[in-house]
Amino acid sequence: MSAGGDFGNPLRKFKLVFLGEQSVGKTSLITRFMYDSFDNTYQATIGIDFLSKTMYLEDRTVRLQLWDTAGQERFRSLIPSYIRDSTVAVVVYDITNVNSFQQTTKWIDDVRTERGSDVIIMLVGNKTDLADKRQVSIEEGERKAKELNVMFIETSAKAGYNVKQLFRRVAAALPGMESTQDRSREDMIDIKLEKPQEQPVNEGGCSC
């Protein structure tokens, strides 16, 4: 059902696929966004998980479909089909693991192979709460994002740092948003997250 700001238009749905190596925090970022919580017990995602969240923006309501992919090699063959019809690819690395950062180039290449330029890509350096173990500087992250022409942000799913800002920036760039290239408007978007009213739909047998 549309909010008043939608002017009678149907609720628009956008697919976000989360990509990256195992244990970089993809599931934790989604959990923090959905429920504002963090689970200290690590459990690998099996296959693909699916959750959705309604976001109330300043002038419209959108439905984000969040697809959480497994980082393990044995599930890699599943991922291209989920990238294929995505609007946004969120490519995550662990700032304490330089290999996970290096592998983001491959993930971004995979996205562009499937989607060409018709996709929003956000590079995310997660786990800033472990700054004393940092192996990848924020400058290195910014440099790679600039070289690959993607968006960039650092986050901490554990501390909740910049997680809402991550989704604000993605929302500002969604198709149909005015001035999608005007980064100065990103902080002006007011996002209200609904409380989960129903059991989220999961695929893949893991809700971690």
Swiss-Prot record:
Motif Switch 1 per record, residues: 32-50
Effect of residue 46 to E: Loss of binding to rabkinesin-6
Post-translational modification: Prenylated.
Activity control note: Regulated by guanine nucleotide exchange factors (GEFs) which promote the exchange of bound GDP for free GTP. Regulated by GTPase activating proteins (GAPs) which increase the GTP hydrolysis activity. Inhibited by GDP dissociation inhibitors (GDIs).
Documented effect of changing residue 72 to L: Loss of binding to rabkinesin-6
A Pfam family matched in the record: Ras
Membrane topology type: Lipid-anchor; Peripheral membrane protein
PTM annotation (Cysteine methyl ester): residues: 208
Intrachain S-S bonds: none
Subcellular location: Golgi apparatus membrane; Cytoplasmic vesicle, Secretory vesicle, Acrosome membrane
Listed PANTHER family: RAS-RELATED PROTEIN RAB
Domain notes: Switch 1, switch 2 and the interswitch regions are characteristic of Rab GTPases and mediate the interactions with Rab downstream effectors. The switch regions undergo conformational changes upon nucleotide binding which drives interaction with specific sets of effector proteins, with most effectors only binding to GTP-bound Rab.
Protein's job: The small GTPases Rab are key regulators of intracellular membrane trafficking, from the formation of transport vesicles to their fusion with membranes. Rabs cycle between an inactive GDP-bound form and an active GTP-bound form that is able to recruit to membranes different sets of downstream effectors directly responsible for vesicle formation, movement, tethering and fusion. RAB6A acts as a regulator of COPI-independent retrograde transport from the Golgi apparatus towards the endoplasmic reticulum (ER). Has a low GTPase activity. Recruits VPS13B to the Golgi membrane.
Name assigned to this protein: Ras-related protein Rab-6A
Source organism of this protein record: Mus musculus (Mouse)
Gene that produces this protein: Rab6a
